[in-house]
Regions:
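Long, C-terminal-biased catalytic regions of enzyme "large/alpha" subunits
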Residues: 1-170
Length: 171
């Protein structure tokens, strides 16, 4: 995402131009891996890594070297692999559709995450629609994150709004 911000001023969730360029870049990387595999008789693959440690380390290094670049080095971490940035407001279905083409290009591994803001048990139909959309769009490995709480007194695990549904503690 930040590479696209540097090159065209927007990431792949923000414009068609950035979306196309992002796919061109990763397609070129995949073609290079395939060519080297054929040339050397070895297995090379393209991995879309969720390298959490590197994303923070690299942005600090780049900020020291290049200064603060809006939309690039002004955050604490870089966006992993081909993901739409977590701060960008986008529907789960659009995010899936934008990230899915990268799964076919990254034969060494990939994952797409969907972040829910509530308890999926309260809307299982929507949860199922997200999973089906992932399948239909070609998401090879998908994950759905949602909030979960744990009451330290009774040990209840689940969504706790204002009151624990098990022991009714309100602290």
């Amino acid at each position: 995402a930040e590479t696209l911000k540097c090159l065209v001023g927007e990431h792949h969730g923000e414009s068609e131009k950035a979306r196309v360029l992002g796919l061109e870049i990763v397609s070129h990387m995949r073609a290079r891996m395939d060519a080297e595999s054929a040339r050397r008789g070895l297995n090379f693959s393209l991995l879309a890594t969720p390298a959490e440690g590197l994303s923070g380390r690299f942005v600090r290094i780049d900020k020291e070297k290049y200064g603060e670049i809006p939309g690039v080095t002004d955050r604490e971490y870089y966006t992993n692999s081909f993901h739409i940035p977590v701060y960008y407001n986008i529907s789960a279905f659009r995010k899936i559709k934008l990230e899915a083409p990268y799964h076919a290009l990254t034969n060494g591994g990939h994952i797409s995450y969907i972040e829910l803001d509530g308890d999926p048990l309260k809307n299982l139909d929507a949860f199922e629609q997200i999973v089906r959309c992932m399948k239909e769009q070609g998401i090879g490995y998908g994950a759905i994150n949602h909030p979960i709480d744990r009451d330290p007194k009774c040990g209840y695990t689940g969504i706790i709004d204002d009151e624990c549904p098990c022991c009714h503690r309100k602290e």
